[in-house]
Amino acid sequence: MKKHDGIIVLLSGGMDSATLLWLAKREFKKVYAISFDYGQRHKVELKYAKELAKLAEVEDHFIVQVPFYTSLKGSALIDESVEVPKGEYPENEPPVTTVPMRNLIFLSIASAFADNLEVNYIGIGVHALDTPYPDCRPEFITAAEAAINAGSTFVAKKKERMHVYAPFLGMSKRDIALLGKELGVPFEKTYSCYMGTEPPCGECPTCIQREEALRGIL
């Protein structure tokens, strides 16, 4: 099977991005990882991201500071005055854990690294159950890819397209877990909890989704 040349993967330390990283190792010749410290309540995830990047033997792992998010209010992930909800996500509206324009900012930063590294794939692990978040929907990914291509020095010089690689868009979290099992992802070394506690709280939406997805696997 022919591999693509290079990719930079958005790596949070959770099960979705870890599975994407292992998939990228299979599908690409060179794999880079990028993680973000944006003042998140669950900053402990970065410890897991570092370990995963090391285990995956990536070319390089970049950790980028995004300090302005601490100035924003209203998101339970970056505003300590907002309580992290318990139970499942709401179905028809963005949850209180939404961080404004997070994936737009992260993809923009990752695209700058991709431009500089001259790799034309940027990997993001959004999936079908992420749709309450506006910046996890297929139409956002399509628009982000178009914007990246319009502004890329790499594209202008090399006459090649940039691609936002989002292979899980049509998959459930359970599907991702099963793929991860097939790929040998060390799920025990991933972290998903909005509270940022160790051990995880087991009650927040991402803890519940993780437990359901990994049932019988981990």
Curated annotation (Swiss-Prot):
Q: Which reaction does it catalyse?
A: 7-carboxy-7-deazaguanine + NH4(+) + ATP = 7-cyano-7-deazaguanine + ADP + phosphate + H2O + H(+)
Tell me the superkingdom of the source. Answer: Bacteria
Q: Is Coiled coil one of the keywords? A: no
Could you list this entry's UniProt keywords, alphabetically sorted.
ATP-binding, Ligase, Metal-binding, Nucleotide-binding, Queuosine biosynthesis, Zinc
Which Pfam families does the record associate with it? QueC
Give the Enzyme Commission number. Answer: 6.3.4.20
Establish whether keyword Zinc is in the entry: yes
User: What cofactor requirement does the entry state?
Assistant: Zn(2+)
Q: Which top EC class is named for this enzyme in its record?
A: ligase
Question: Per its UniProt record, what InterPro entries does this chain match?
Answer: QueC, Rossmann-like_a/b/a_fold
| Positions that bind Zn(2+) | C193, C201, C204, C207
Q: One of this protein's GO BP terms?
A: queuosine biosynthetic process
Binding residue positions for ATP: L11, S12, G13, G14, M15, D16, S17, A18, T19, L20, L21
Q: Name one GO molecular function term.
A: zinc ion binding
Query: What is the UniProt remark on how the cofactor binds and its stoichiometry?
Result: Binds 1 zinc ion per subunit.
Q: Quick one: which pathway?
A: Purine metabolism; 7-cyano-7-deazaguanine biosynthesis
Q: Which family does it belong to?
A: Belongs to the QueC family.
Which NCBIfam families does the protein's record reference? 7-cyano-7-deazaguanine synthase QueC
Q: What does the function comment of this entry state?
A: Catalyzes the ATP-dependent conversion of 7-carboxy-7-deazaguanine (CDG) to 7-cyano-7-deazaguanine (preQ(0)).
Q: What is this protein called?
A: 7-cyano-7-deazaguanine synthase
Q: Please tell me the species this chain comes from.
A: Aquifex aeolicus (strain VF5)
